[in-house]
């Protein structure tokens, strides 16, 4: 089975430039391969089998970044096409934008090219990066890949994917059951009559967020003050997101320990958020994310 651990990393100025360069090259190769596939199919009515290696002669600066990051960009594109062919409702693969809120790249652990220590992380074609590791990684976990990302707030993170042995859990008859139903106020209601008591973090921060966004609208676009204020707005959103995730992690963990089986109603949350003026409330609840956490 696979386990993921997300950690905060603190790259210096040179390392930040290298990370941004790798993210940019991964985005470029994804978009270029997608454009060439579309163009080739329009002419030949066949799928083009292109690889990142075929672009390095024309674009030699691609050699400056981690080749595994480019290979993963190719895998992500192929995965997007498979999803589209399997389920057209997912939509045709789209170009990646430089202005996307969250930018990232993925590299794989091969032949000791990635080194993880208590306070440092060594990535391919990069010097050692300072990190903050909040938990001890078991010695029998094998590192598979690392995804480096930059959040809108400017913070950098590394998501470490490990391969570990399946944990055998003794099966026993379910005795303690709980039913959960969606609720606009408090996120959900339990069959015991209790409510989850979700504090509605977005609603509480709405006035402050509106004030910061109003300041942003008055700044000259792309100026230094604009970038500073944009970061403040991103930090507000990040705090709300972290508060929501912390609450849901703790609640899902508590329910998983107290009950043997939990039954939930199958709802079209996307449809609910799109109609009846419920969008803001449904998205603030994060009910879908809570069910996902409860599942694992």
Model-predicted regions and their roles:
Residues 1-70:
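Gly/serine-rich nucleotide phosphate-binding loop at the start of the catalytic core
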Residues 3-6, 139-142, 152-296:
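Positively charged, helix-rich recognition surfaces that bind polyanionic ligands
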Residues 7-9, 129-135, 196-198:
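Generic detection of short hydrophobic beta-strand segments and adjacent strand-loop junctions
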Residues 15, 26, 66-73, 244-251, ...:
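Hydrophobic (often cysteine-bearing) scaffold residues that line and stabilize catalytic clefts
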Residues 26-37, 73-76, 80-81, 85, ...:
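Short, Φ-rich (hydrophobic/aromatic) sequence segments
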Residues 34, 38-41, 81, 85-92, ...:
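Long, hydrophobic, amphipathic alpha-helical segments used as structural scaffolds
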Residues 50-152:
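Acidic carboxylate diad motif detector
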């Amino acid at each position: 089975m696979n386990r993921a651990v997300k950690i905060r990393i603190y790259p210096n100025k040179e390392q930040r430039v290298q990370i941004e360069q790798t993210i940019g090259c991964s985005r470029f190769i994804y978009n270029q391969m997608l454009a060439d596939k579309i163009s080739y199919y329009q002419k030949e009515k066949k799928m083009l089998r292109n690889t990142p290696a075929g672009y390095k002669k024309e674009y030699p600066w691609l050699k400056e970044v981690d080749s595994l990051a480019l290979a993963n960009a190719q895998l992500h594109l192929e995965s997007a096409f498979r999803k589209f062919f399997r389920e057209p409702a997912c939509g045709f693969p789209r170009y990646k934008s430089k202005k996307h809120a969250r930018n990232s790249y993925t590299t794989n652990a091969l032949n000791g090219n990635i080194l993880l220590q208590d306070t440092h992380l060594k990535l391919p074609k990069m010097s050692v990066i300072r990190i903050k590791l909040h938990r001890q990684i078991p010695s029998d976990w094998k590192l598979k890949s690392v995804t480096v990302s930059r959040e809108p707030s400017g913070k950098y993170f590394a998501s470490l994917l490990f391969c570990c042995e399946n944990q055998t859990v003794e099966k026993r008859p379910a005795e303690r059951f709980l039913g959960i139903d969606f609720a606009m106020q408090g996120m959900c209601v339990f069959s015991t009559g209790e409510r989850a008591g979700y504090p509605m973090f977005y609603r509480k921060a709405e006035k402050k967020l509106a004030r910061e966004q109003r300041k942003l609208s008055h700044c000259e676009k792309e100026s230094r003050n604009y970038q500073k204020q944009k970061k403040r707005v991103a930090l507000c959103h990040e705090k709300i997101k972290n508060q929501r995730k912390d609450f849901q992690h703790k609640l899902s963990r508590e329910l998983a320990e107290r009950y043997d089986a939990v039954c939930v109603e199958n709802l079209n949350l996307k449809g609910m958020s799109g109609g009846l003026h419920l969008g803001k409330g449904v998205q603030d609840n994060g009910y879908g994310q809570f069910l996902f956490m409860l599942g694992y």
